[in-house]
Amino acid sequence: MDPSQNPNIVHATTIISVRRGGHVAVAGDGQVTLGHTVMKGNARKVRRLGREGQVLAGFAGAAADAFTLFELFEAKLDKHGQLTRAAVELAKDWRTERRLGKLEALLAVADKETSLIISGTGDVIEPEDGIIAIGSGGAYALSAARALLAHTELDAKTIATEAINIAGDICIYTNRNVVVEEL
């Protein structure tokens, strides 16, 4: 749903995951918007998951729904111990459990080897170029990250941070208060 169509939904963020040089970084902005009002500027939408923090995850969408998905995904990760298997098992549940079908959120998850998007329809998508960008500023961040990867020697963490900053300059639902995690 377009954020402007329902002013009562908490929405809009930008999350990006970038791989370079054997490292992966996931970054997100800190803005939470309700309707046309910024409610919070320093939300933490990127977290480490798993027993040893071996998976990075970021969310876009309704905050309460995203926290529910974080919890469910982490339970699957603890049970299966492997990112792809946990994502597929969560996606199966998302498609079959009635309460999950109504959740309005996307997850971007990454470990040392794999990056995945878990979509609101229960799809699990692996990007072909190792970059994930979701949320209202996702297209801007994706474009910035691709350009920085192609034309600089910057590391994954710096590219992810700069991509969020560029998106924050363009997208009104994204700010420059960046939280970034790296493996």
From Swiss-Prot:
Membrane-crossing segments per the record: none
Subcellular location(s) of the protein: Cytoplasm
Molecular function GO terms recorded: metal ion binding; threonine-type endopeptidase activity
EC number: 3.4.25.2
Binding positions for Na(+) per the UniProt entry: 168, 171, 174
Gene3D superfamilies noted in UniProt: Glutamine Phosphoribosylpyrophosphate, subunit 1, domain 1
A GO cellular-component term linked to this record: proteasome core complex
Catalytic activity: ATP-dependent cleavage of peptide bonds with broad specificity
Protein's name according to its UniProt entry: ATP-dependent protease subunit HslV
Native species: Xanthomonas oryzae pv. oryzae (strain MAFF 311018)
Encoding gene per record: hslV
